[in-house]
Amino acid sequence: MAFHGHLPHEMTMQALGADDAAVAAAAAAGGVGAGGAPAWMRYNDGSFLHLQTTSDSSASPSGAAAAAAAAAAAAAAGVQQWMGGGGGGEDAVAAAMGGGGEADAARCKAEILAHPLYEQLLSAHVACLRIATPVDQLPRIDAQLAQSQGVVAKYSALAAAAAGDDGRELDQFMTHYVLLLCSFKEQLQQHVRVHAMEAVMACWELEQNLQSLTGASPGEGTGATMSDGEDDQADSEANMYDPSLDGADNMGFGLPTESERSLMERVRQELKHELKQGYKEKLIDIREEILRKRRAGKLPGDTTSTLKAWWQSHAKWPYPTEEDKARLVQETGLQLKQINNWFINQRKRNWHSNPSSSTSVKTKRKSNAGDNNS
């Protein structure tokens, strides 16, 4: 279907704040979901997308956690439904051909799948899911995404049949949904980052208390940081870990569980990313300074040819006088220090290959040997 609203592309890429997300949700719920809007835009409780975006849900840590949990559950259910996990993709299309309430829902899904913003909607939805999903569960999301083309193909016939409908309401709905998910992703990232760090610090304090009570040194699960040089060693130790050894550890101490490992790894990656971003400009400046010094240390080719010509003409005694150096400064445009350094390095490079110098060294050795024998 055509994108009737001709909404600017930038609107789908920007991220709203918490207040802006609430305004967008209210506008979509009040202006779009009223009257004769399609069934997929109306909910019995009057909420928009079943997401809690009011100020009450974020006024306290418990409210934020409840909102995040409810939103994650709704997002998981949505992905399961759109990816065909809810069952009956073909059944829904068949029911749509026959008519009824299921037919209206199937047609609405077909319109969403055929909308130009569907790919951005799916990407924003999956991005929210990936934030709070454990690392070992991420392949399940990828497996469901692999089925998306099949879902689109199932509803393509219905989308072609509904192409003549007015899509302004759907345009507005899709735009608000994408913007809201982008804003919600930022909130989820902040929520997970803060509470994950608090969880790691709490585990570290528990292990410190255990050490003070029992005298046992803290195990691998401490909150101590590690340098980049120790990452490979830590990864190798993690690969040697046998989960069966945790069977007798009923008190929760000792080696961390798989979920704790996943949480700590996520926090460590987040901190490493923030450090790289914080020092990115300084690292670039240092790199440019090193490259500039390297370029400054190399002399131009025409100047070195002049110095090499003087070297070859004075191969028996390659030590220029002050007058020779002054003349070379005028001819090459180099500084006196650069010329001195070049001759020093050139003599080192050609010390053993210079026949005159090797002959003089042999003569000195023979004379010294004769004096010692006498």
Curated annotation (Swiss-Prot):
Tissue: Isoforms 1 and 2 are expressed in roots, stems, shoot meristem, leaf blades, leaf sheaths and flowers. Isoform 3 is expressed in stems, shoot meristem, rachis, leaf blades and leaf sheaths.
Stretch list, region Disordered: 214-242, 347-374
ELK domain boundaries: 270-290
Keywords of this entry: DNA-binding, Homeobox, Nucleus, Transcription, Transcription regulation
Cellular localization per UniProt: Nucleus
Predominant location: nucleus
Classification via CDD domains: homeodomain (cd00086)
InterPro entries (alphabetical): ELK_dom, HD, Homeodomain-like_sf, KN_HD, KNOX1, KNOX2, TALE_homeobox
BP-aspect Gene Ontology terms: regulation of DNA-templated transcription
Top-level lineage group: Eukaryota
Pfam families documented for this protein: ELK, Homeobox_KN, KNOX1, KNOX2
GO MF term (any one): DNA binding
DNA-binding region coordinates: 291-354
PROSITE patterns tied to this protein: ELK, HOMEOBOX_1, HOMEOBOX_2
One GO CC term on file: nucleus
Purpose: Isoform 3 acts as a transcription activator, but isoforms 1 and 2 do not.
PANTHER family: HOMEOBOX PROTEIN TRANSCRIPTION FACTORS
Family membership: Belongs to the TALE/KNOX homeobox family.
UniProt name for this protein: Homeobox protein knotted-1-like 13
The organism of origin for this protein: Oryza sativa subsp. japonica
